[in-house]
A protein has these predicted regions:
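Positively charged
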Residues: 1-161
């Protein structure tokens, strides 16, 4: 396992690009999953998309405080309800804003063994699924932040967008 550099939205245009589906789960993909997990934990994050470490592949890792989830080619297939909560992002350090998300989602993806799995997430986990899958589509949380809720705790960097 190795730590990877986390892309920054101000310097790395890759974050606005759409990721490609994983065609073959091989040793490189499994190593990437391990590296992403280590990188996420090292940065005290709750989720990370492959694009955030510079790889345009549809891969995410999430830890909601109960379990580590590693997903390949995830897709949200159902959404229920609504929540509006504060979000941040490892690629946009020190910036937070309120984002409208579904209260519950159903996600289909491949696991590390290439098996199709279906997961449900509510609350924080639903937000994490949506946030990380947005990354795979080149969408950042600041693109969806509710008006008037964006906060930048980096006093020396007032310009967000």
């Amino acid at each position: 396992m190795a730590l990877r550099n986390i892309m920054n939205f101000k310097k790395d245009d890759i974050l606005k690009k759409k990721s490609r589906a994983v065609e073959n789960i091989d040793g490189r993909i499994l190593t990437l999953l391990e590296d992403m997990t280590e990188t996420m934990y090292n940065a005290n994050g709750a989720g990370l998309a492959a694009v955030q470490v510079g790889i345009l592949k549809r891969i995410i890792v999430i830890d909601d405080g109960r379990v580590l989830i590693k997903l390949i080619n995830p897709v949200i297939v159902e959404e229920f309800g609504e929540q509006q909560e504060l979000e941040g992002c490892l690629s946009i350090p020190g910036v937070y804003g309120r984002v409208k998300r579904p209260e519950k989602v159903v996600v289909e993806a491949l696991n590390e063994r290439g098996q199709l799995i279906t997961l449900e997430g509510t609350g924080l986990l639903a937000r994490a699924f949506c946030h990380e899958i947005d990354h795979l589509n080149g969408i950042l949380f600041i693109d969806k932040v509710l008006p008037g809720t964006l906060v930048n705790i980096n006093q020396s960097e007032p310009e967000i967008r």
